Regions:
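Short catalytic/ligand-binding loop motif for oxyanion handling, primarily in non-cytosolic enzymes
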Residues: 14, 71-75, 114-117, 148-152, ...
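Conserved S-adenosyl-L-methionine
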Residues: 47-49, 135-146
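Flexible, glycine-/basic-rich loop-and-beta segments that form/coincide
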Residues: 149-231
Length: 418
């Protein structure tokens, strides 16, 4: 069958469908450099801005594929949805194309949060619009992990067929395998080396973890700024208090507020506690309470390590997310991600999600003392046969992070089009 590839990126839909004998007759991608790579790989030069194309001139096709922009609905983005100035409007251009060309199949991809966005109203609206054009629609959240690809990457996959789906079944999950090692290269193309500052972060947390008594519980996340803090968090917030009352308390790392101005006090409160609200949400209260309880129990040895943590450059480096409960506290056998929410540690079974928003969050393989390499990212995303792609950090990681996973697309396509 003939298909079109909208918001094409590196061409994940193209790779998956063409490998099954389908023919791409049209593509669209707004970024110039990715259009160039698409042409080099597939000998089709994509159109640019979808809002400026002549919809009538799009060739007839049986399948419409689109990984339409996810930032408006993403938790990692700003979740503005249809209010997003540009990207939030892309769905309506898709509708125009569908209405004009009436393809037999629709195959779409987006972030899982699309389902929950605006309390489900956004997805309900979109689904009804597609159904109104005569399609039966189904959707499911799937991760490459479901098919033994070592990447945690939940995405929403949407399939639709004119009139009815005729017994379409989503592909079955496979028995999990801890197989990241099979995707690692002997001669990796490492685009970036870890900075000296991040090495200090790793060594600091390595030292901290080595001091934790055996069988001790480690809260996740651990917000070390709460060590020694006494500002209120259960039924009130610093913002809701009078200056004279705050001056009797302590801020991050036990800094006394005595004789401080309100501005000075807020400079010594963690960023997450500076919000202008009278009460914190339950989840934040829980995180703060757990960290303070941990400190109370472990104060004697923690205070000896604390100066090293305080010396770390950013607040994000002072927060630890240990996603390995039950494991030995051995940092050097784990995968490390430097995120805005903290230093995230996970088991070495699979890669965390490759994201487009930041090149700073590329997974670091502590036992290899390097970041996940360019060729390994390509293999995990199913692009290992791709000949041409961005060669630099600032271009490659956003492109691969935005791409659909080729193996997942292939699995669904096989069931949908067979």
């Amino acid at each position: 069958m003939k298909f079109i590839d909208l918001f094409a990126g590196l061409g994940g839909f193209h790779l998956a469908l063409s490998n099954q004998g389908h023919k791409c007759v049209y593509a669209c991608e707004i970024e110039k450099s990715l259009r160039d790579y698409y042409f080099q790989n597939f000998e089709i030069y994509p159109e640019g801005d979808i809002t400026k194309i002549d919809i009538e001139k799009i060739p007839n096709h049986d399948i419409l594929c689109a990984g339409f922009p996810c930032q408006p609905f993403s938790k990692a983005g700003n979740s503005k949805g249809f209010k997003h100035q540009v990207a939030g409007k892309m769905f309506f251009y898709l509708l125009k194309i569908i209405k004009t060309h009436n393809p037999k199949f629709l195959f779409l991809e987006n972030v899982p949060n699309l389902i929950a966005h605006d309390k489900g109203r956004t997805w309900d609206f979109m689904k009804k619009k597609i159904m109104k054009l005569g399609y039966q629609i189904d959707q499911k959240i799937i991760s490459p992990l479901d098919f033994n690809v070592p990447q945690t990457r939940d995405r929403l996959y949407i399939v639709a067929k004119k009139n009815e789906l005729n017994g379409f079944k989503w592909p079955d999950k496979l028995k999990p395998k801890n197989n990241l090692k099979n995707y690692l290269s002997k001669n990796p193309k490492v685009l970036r080396k870890i900075t000296e500052k991040r090495e200090i972060v790793i060594n600091t947390w390595k030292y901290f973890l080595s001091k934790i008594p055996k069988n001790n519980y480690l809260p996740n996340p651990l917000w070390t700024m709460e060590f020694g803090a006494t500002y209120p968090y259960k039924d009130k917030t610093p913002h809701s208090m009078k200056l004279t009352d705050l001056q009797k308390l302590k801020g991050k790392f036990g800094v006394s507020f005595k004789n401080m101005t309100k501005q000075e006090i807020f400079e010594n409160i963690p960023n997450y506690a500076k919000v202008r609200t009278k009460t914190f949400p339950d989840w934040k209260i829980r995180m703060i309470r757990r960290t303070r309880e941990f400190y109370t129990i472990n104060k004697k040895w923690v205070d000896k390590v604390l100066p090293k943590i305080i010396a770390l450059e950013f607040e994000a480096y002072q927060k630890l997310e240990w996603n390995c409960q039950g494991d030995k506290f051995n940092l050097l056998k784990k995968i490390i991600s430097f995120r805005g929410s903290g230093v995230r540690i996970r088991r070495n079974h699979s890669s965390p999600t490759l994201i487009s928003a930041s090149t700073s969050q590329v997974p670091y393989l502590a036992w290899k003392k390097r970041y996940l390499s360019l060729d390994e990212c390509l293999k995990i995303q199913g692009f290992d046969k791709l000949k041409y792609y961005p060669p630099t950090v600032d271009k490659f990681y956003p492109a691969i992070g935005n791409a659909v996973n080729v193996k997942v697309i292939s699995k669904i396509a096989k069931n949908l089009f067979s």
